[in-house]
Amino acid sequence: MLGRIVVGVALLCVVVGAPARAEYAEEAFFGKPNPSYRIPTPDGSGLSPIIGEVQIYRVRKGDTLMDLARLYSLGYNEIVEANPEIDPWVPPVGATVLLPTQWILPCCTYNGVVVNIPEMRLFYYQPQGDGTTIVHTYPVGLGRDEWRTPAGSFRISGKTVNPTWNIPASIRAEHIRERGDYRTSIPGGDPDNPLGKYRFELTMPMYRIHGTNIPWGVGMQVSHGCIRLYPEDIERLFPLVPVGTPGQFIYQTV
């Protein structure tokens, strides 16, 4: 953990109720709790607060780990790593699923948007002016090995609702080669548009933070380098983050 001192090392587990399978319509995900936490503002001392608490879930008929991950603001990587013996598509009814909804904040002093690449998780720090900071955290999907998301600093340079995807030449060549798709752009609102409904433009050329049309890809390396969030998470984050907000892509193991 890079020599970090951890505040609040006690592991807390909460048993959560099992909602009916019918609640996993798209509306259920947009109604889930927002993972936000108030902490003392980081001061660069090396202290890394823990936010959240581990939860336990009992599987019901029809559940998948993908649905549970999305419902509890986890990525595919997080829920599968926490439950290696459970079939992610057909978990046994009554099985105990560990929901790793507790996170060590990246070290040390950050402001704005921070994406920890190895963790596949975004943190948005909002200082409150009273010595505290509200931290919002969401799982993300990242670039594939051949399109790896780089480390670096940036600022939010723009925000777009229903963005058109102007397909870069390199990606278009891949689409032509793999599936004979010759489109040069996909308009906003089209179900084939991988940007989803919201997009943050960055000062880091060629990279963006946006939604997705494939929610199960959150917690996987499936993009061409951009950062993907669940549709409901980007919808919550979008109005909170103003243009000009600083950000970083970092590599810190946890």
Regions found by a protein language model. Name each.
Residues 29-73:
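Primarily a LysM-type cell-wall glycan-binding module
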Residues 106-213:
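Gly/Pro-biased beta-strand-loop elements
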Residues 62, 92-97, 244-247:
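Loop/turn positions that initiate beta-strands
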Residues 18-22:
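Sec/Tat signal peptide C-region and signal peptidase I cleavage site
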Residues 54, 77-85, 96-111, 136-143, ...:
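N-terminal post-signal-peptidase region of extra-cytosolic proteins
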Residues 60-90, 131-134:
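LysM (lysin motif) carbohydrate-binding repeats in extracellular/periplasmic proteins that recognize
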Residues 235-254:
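N-terminal targeting pre-sequences for secretion and organelle import
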Residues 6-15:
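Bacterial N-terminal signal peptides
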